[in-house]
Amino acid sequence: AHGKRVNAGQTCIAPDYVLLPRGQEAEFAEAFRTAARRPCPRFAGNPDYAAILTKRHLARLRQMLRQAQGMGAHVEWMEDGGAGQESADMAWGDAVERQMAPALVFNATSQMQLMQEEIFGPILPVISYDRLDDVVSAINAGPRPLALYWFGRDEKVRDAVLSRTISGGVTVNDTLLHFAHENLPFGGVGDSGWGAYHSEQGFARLSHQKAVFVQSRWSGASMLYPPYGARFDRIMELMRRWL
């Protein structure tokens, strides 16, 4: 929940979908709602909750949700509903304040727009799975992610997933925090970028190491320069013998 609440999900490492064991949907929705609303009991008109950057981006997020619902997805809002106009406006994103409450999208499929591009908003698709191999296959089927988040206490299962997938960075049992750790490099791999900054690696990445070669006054390299003659032939013959 924290990863989608920070800046209303408008960060490059906000989670774009959740892979959830089938049968835990209701439990997850309740836990997500509790976690999302603990620091932010109300999203509408809350100055501590970020707005969507532009009206155009807000319209894009609305379209994503409408398309998903039209294709059979179920949307659960983290803002309480009701008969009041304020609640209704908040659900679809207030056009004046451009705030949109976090929303879970169940029954999301790969054919939906929100599963085909970076969401960059407070919408979180949920994909149910039956086997751990389904998790690995789903992650590896898409572009290599900038961040991957694992939640669970079984270290063997965790290590199995992390060893079989590729991502820019990982946070275990939380989100976003590998970005903030001063001793960890941050960066992507493949489609999510290349190279890293932060920490010692960042200093090297963002510094230029100027190469300087100083030729000594007496150098054997001059014997290898043209024009080539008998002396060069003798040198090459010796090199062939010893090498």
Q: Where are the language model's segments positioned?
A:
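Conserved C-terminal structural/oligomerization subdomain of aldehyde/semialdehyde dehydrogenase
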Residues: 89-243
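ALDH superfamily catalytic-core signature
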Residues: 1-109, 132, 172, 240-241
